[in-house]
Each structure stands twice: as structure tokens, then as C-alpha cells.
Amino acid sequence: MGVHSFLCSSPWFRMVTDLQKEIQEAVQQRRNFAIISHPDAGKTTLTEKLLLYGGAIQEAGAVKAKRSQRAATSDWMELEKQRGISITSTVLQFNYHDCTINLLDTPGHQDFSEDTYRTLAAADNAVMLEDAAKGLEPQTRKLFEVCRMRNIPIFTFFNKMDRPGREPLELLDEIEQELGLQTYAVNWPIGSGDRFRGVFDRRKQQVHLFERSVHGKRQAKDTTLEWGDPQLADLIEPDLLQQLQDELELLEGVGTEFDLEAIHAGQLTPVFWGSAMTNFGVELFLEAFLDYALKPGARRSSVGDMAPDYPEFSGFVFKLQANMDPRHRDRIAFVRVCTGKFEKDMTVQHARSGRTLRLSRPQKLFGQDREVLDDAYPGDVIGLNNPGMFAIGDTIYTGKRLEYDGIPCFSPEIFAYLRNPNPSKFKPFRKGVSELREEGAVQIMYSADSAKRDPILAAVGQLQLEVVQYRLENEYGVETLLEPLPFSVARWVEGGWDVLEKVGRLFNTTTVKDTWGRPVLLFKNEWNLRQIEADHPELQLRSVAPVAAGQEPIEV
């Protein structure tokens, strides 16, 4: 017997290949995506309707629901329920047909984009949700740029077609012209506003006519007719039918051809139309998404690209959340599984510290609800109890040492000193600030002047600062004061402290240090920034800073 034959017949080899086969089968069934949108585009509504069709919930509850209705499944923090907006990212896993779908629900409110940036690091696909009356909006553009940095596939869903909106062809043109992204309409709307009659599915050449379900709470009844069915003339007004025919001919004649490779490269976006509130087009979108979306794939690490069927387990932390259950004062690390098979009670290595950890109480997350998890595969997200060990971007693994690329910090736009007026509350104040910093609720910076000890909160929007104050008071019993600072732009100095010292005094800017002690310059406006960039290119100012892998944050 040759060496190759001997190895192939050995129990160890069979065990590895059986495990790889099991992982490959699980990966084939996995789809993972995040929804990016501007506030009020209907993100929470679409999320709930996807869960409704996936059987994960029996009844969808509007976000700003009446008291008799349920609160939205994906909004669980008390402040979110009060305001009717999503502030933190949550993870929702559900099954549809033979697929397991991991929906990384991100905040749609404009003040919470940094949490969204981090969530996009764990997503394989993004769904760009747009209001058909408004088209592209500023928040969506920002998030699109983050998707482009990672070259992930983007699926577009134009929502609120049952309300007056812009012309569909005009909306496609806007995406192509402003984002440089080619479009392919997978389905096409029949009318709009109060004359919205449904959609035409170009994949199967079928017309889907929808009846509104009661407030969209239940799955919509779907009447499906083949294109060319004589009944269409009785069910759709002649002018709408003619308009549909003309627009379809135009799409076939001058529209982009379908190209799955271009979709996977993030160069072509499949486009869908519907109304999440009334369930129009939601299931059609879901079925096409499962066919077209990228399955969990290889991810770049310190030892090269890691394929998902690599038999050793690995994953990275993309989010931390404290006090998901205020009764237990818990802290949860959200881990995206990248390779291998995760199993309850397994022992892993923590790359940054080198410590060995036993993962004894892993959890499957569904908004605020959790259940103990026995196993998970690439593309899944698991919740781990976090006794202060994990930081955003951390890698855990079995087998040979590896580390995944860090999750970058993005430039904040609002800055304020956080003051603790009550000296007797110093310990809970420090603990609260430290835990909220670890969680990534806000960036924490400090003055380069060591005499100024108060932390500087750095956020992408005012509401983020309010959330920190709210949580410090409600979860740690500490009342705080904010002292706004007159800056709106931050840039990391890639050249480091040495280069900064050689440059000497800089006008119209203030120097601070970030969580890892790296120099950051704060500017009052873009004009001041451009002036310093022109005068001192050696500073190498950056708007995005990588997570400082392997470094411990400085003490609060």
C-alpha cells in the first residue's frame, strides 16, 4: 500500500474529509446579508416581512406600533422602543425553504452609521433599500462606499411603490450615474401609488398581482399569471398594461444583461420593486436573493485566504453589546464564523492575548431572544458571553494561529467632553465608559494634554452621544454632562507621533489620542483640513484607521 493510499484510508483522514463535506453542505445552504438604507426608507418593516415569510415570526408589528400591537422584533433597547428607530445592530437568523439566512439588522437612523460599518464587515451581501419617491439619499451613499471597499454584492429594493414615487427608469439611471453601479431589473413594477398592481417577474416571465393583506401583517395573497395570459387584460388597466409592455421592450433593448459574476464582484446590482408595508414583492425578492447571493466564501487573514471548509474553526468579533438583558447585566460578543464548525464547549485560542478560552455557553441570537447553541457553520453569527476579554476585530481560532483583518474606525463628526460631576460615582463612571467603548457605542479619545483627564466622546451623530448618556444613567447609575467641542472633522496621523513632533505647532487644529494612543487631529471644517494636508503631506492624514490588532487599549 502506498503512502497516499494509507493516508486516505486512515480514520483521521476520513474524519477530516467527512467534516469538510459537512461544512461544505452547510455553506451551500447559508446566506448572510445586511440591509443598508437611509432613515425612514422602511428597513425595519422589510426586515419583519422577510422574517414573516421565513416563518420566524407569525405577525409583523410596525415600528411605531399602537400599544395593542407588538413592538418591532429587531428593535429591543428601551430607547429604541421609545423613539421607534433602530439604534443598535441585531442578528436575526431564520430558515426559508432549505436555506439558513443570517440577517444582520443594522440601524437605519443617520446617527448610527458606525455600528452599521462594523456590521458590514461581517456581511457577505448587502441589500440597498431605497424609498421609490426619494431615490438615493446621503446615508445610503455613505454605506454604499463601505460596501464598495469590500466589493460585496449589492441587491437593490425600491420600497413604497404603493405610494406616489419617481419613474422607475429614472431611479435606475440615478444608481448608474451617481454610484457607477450597473443595474439589472429582476422584476418590474406595474403602476405605482394607488394604481400599483404588482410586479412582472422577468426570471419566470410571470405577472404577480397582489392583494393588500391587513396592514401587511400576514403573507400577501399572490395571484400569478403567465405573460400573455388573456386574463391580464381584465385584471390590469389597458394603459398600465401598455406601459409595462413598452418598458419591458426598452429594458430588453438597451438595459444591462444579467451577469452573476458581475453581481458577485459588486459591479452589477439586481433591482427589485415592491412595498414592504403591504408585502408586495417581498417573497419574490427573497427567492431571487437566495439564488443570486454569495454564499460564505474565503476571508483574508494573516496566513492567507481562509476557505470556509478549512476544518479548523475560526471567527472574528464584529460587535459587542452590554446589558442586552438588564436583569443579568450581561455582555455579549457577536462572532461571525469564518471557517470550520463551531461546537458548544469547544476550546479556542484568543489571537490578541494568546489565551485559551472554553466557550461553554454559546448563544443563538434573535433580536433580544436567545437560546443555547450546539453548533454553527461559516456565515452564522454566534453570541458569546464576554467577561471583558473580547474587543471588536478580535479573532478566535483552533489549530494554527491566524488573525483576520481588523475592522476600521471611521472619522467621527461630533465631539464633546464627557464630565462626571459626582466624584463618588467615579468607579461606575469609569466602568461604564470602558464597557461602552469596548462595545463600540462611541469612539473615545483623550486630549494630548495629560492634565485634561476627561474622555472625549467622538461620534458620527448627536443621538449617539445621547445614547451614551442614557445608558450610563440607566445601566450604571451615573448622571453625566456633555461639553461640546467646536470640531467636525477627524483625521488619524499615519506618520505617527514622531512625524507630528517634527512638524511642530499646527494652527486651527487640536491634537488628541484615540483608544490605542494613536495621534488624531481634530479640525473645525474641511477647509482647515485641506490647508494642513497641503502644507504637511508627511503627516499622511487618514479618514479611516484600521483596528490596532494585537494592541491593548489605553486605560480609561
Curated annotation (Swiss-Prot):
tr-type G domain span: 28-297
Subcellular location per the Swiss-Prot or TrEMBL entry: Cytoplasm
GO cellular component term of the entry, any: cytosol
GO terms for MF: GTP binding; GTPase activity; translation release factor activity, codon nonspecific; translation release factor activity, codon specific
UniProt-listed Gene3D superfamilies: P-loop containing nucleotide triphosphate hydrolases (3.40.50.300), Peptide chain release factor 3, domain III (3.30.70.3280), Translation factors (2.40.30.10)
Keyword Metal-binding: no
PANTHER family per record: PEPTIDE CHAIN RELEASE FACTOR RF3
Similarity comment: family membership: Belongs to the TRAFAC class translation factor GTPase superfamily. Classic translation factor GTPase family. PrfC subfamily.
Record NCBIfam families: prfC, PRK00741.1, small_GTP
UniProt-recorded name of the protein: Peptide chain release factor 3
Native source organism of the sequence: Synechococcus elongatus (strain ATCC 33912 / PCC 7942 / FACHB-805) (Anacystis nidulans R2)
Gene: prfC
